[in-house]
Every structure is written in C-alpha cells, then in structure tokens.
Amino acid sequence: MITELDSVLLDVPNLAEAKAAYSRLFGTSTPHPQLHLGLPEWASHPGMLFRVEDLPSVTRMVDRRGLTLTSHADLATGQAHGLTLGLAERPAPSAPPDGDSSRIDHLVLFSPNRDRIIATLCGRLGFDLRLDRMQSWGVHQLFFRCAGLVVEVVLRDDDPSGPDSLWGIAWRTADIDASCARLQKADVTLSDIRNGHKPGTRVATVKDRTLAVPTILIEQR
C-alpha cells in the first residue's frame, strides 16, 4: 500500500529562520524533498504524507478503515487525533541533499493512547508494530515500521482522549564526529555525543529551536 515516506509537515513560526537552520543542519542550501516547512492550508497540524501507487484505490481503502481523507490534486489528506496524515501519488522525490546528515532515520510521535495510535498506524495505514517496550527509566515506547520508515511513539501518561503529536526527527549520519565538528564550526549548539539506547548507535542532540522539532543525529555502527 504505502511505498515510502513522501514528506514530513512541520509548523515553523518563522519560515526564513527554519530554512536557514536546516541549511546549517545539512550543510547545503538545497531544500530537502521530504521536509515541508510551514503547514499548507489543508493541514491544521504537523504530520506525515506517504507515497502510494494508486491514490484513488488506497484512499478508498483507508476511508473504509476509518480515516476520512479529502482530495487535493495529487494528495488525499485528513486529520487523526492531532496529526495530519495523508497519501500522495506523484513522481518519486529527488534524492536528499548531498549532506552528511540529511537522511531521516526515524520520526518520533507522542501519544497518550496506546490502542488508538496502534489503530491509526497499523489498522488504517498498514504499519507493522515491531516493538512494545517499557524502558527501565519508565518510558513506554512503541516502534512501528512501514516501507523502510521507522516511527517511534512515546506513550505519555496523560488524558487518553488528548491529541497525538509529531514530536521529533532523528537524522542518520555515517560519521557523527565529523557531522558534529561541522555543525560546531557553524555555531550550532550540540550536546555531547553519547551512546544511544539502541545497541551500536551513538547520538547527539541538536539544540536549535528554529528547527521546529527536537532533533538528534544518530550514527549506526
């Protein structure tokens, strides 16, 4: 059904500042094809669009599964408990910009309702729930996968009728030491490099509010 991630929709208070921040992050001014900075008029919340091969057919199937979508040319989008979700049928996106940290490793969502977010991602969009884990420090995480995209959901101990939200992006780098050195030369504030929760990973937090969402770099050894 879903073939790949089309784009991530981010709500940015200042578009020019956000563009500059992502140019610093990637080390290039070339726009990232999977980032939509600023919400379109049909998106009331940040969220995700997914690429499909037969938009009318998949839209009907998703609608039957309980997610009502509205057509916008080559898109069909809707709202799901605080997230904008949608489908797109259009030519394959251009390659990510030629930077050292410009590939999306995974997305992070917040949700107060385990069953509801599973129904949204698995029941309506066809994701697989790969891992349901309670960390030793008390954080409950769900990990989903679909067409190469990993989505991590952090379950919040809030009112279960409250909204879900797009919370953060992890960007893959082949050499986190080199990426951090480049960013520090560009006056970007970073955390120290540390071991990630996943064995064999190292991560660093990028402390730049103009990126609009919490952002980390991750290296997989």
Describe each model-derived feature in a short phrase.
Residues 13, 31-33, 40, 46, ...:
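Proline-rich intrinsically disordered, low-complexity coils
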Residues 1-14, 37-113, 133, 137, ...:
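Vicinal oxygen chelate
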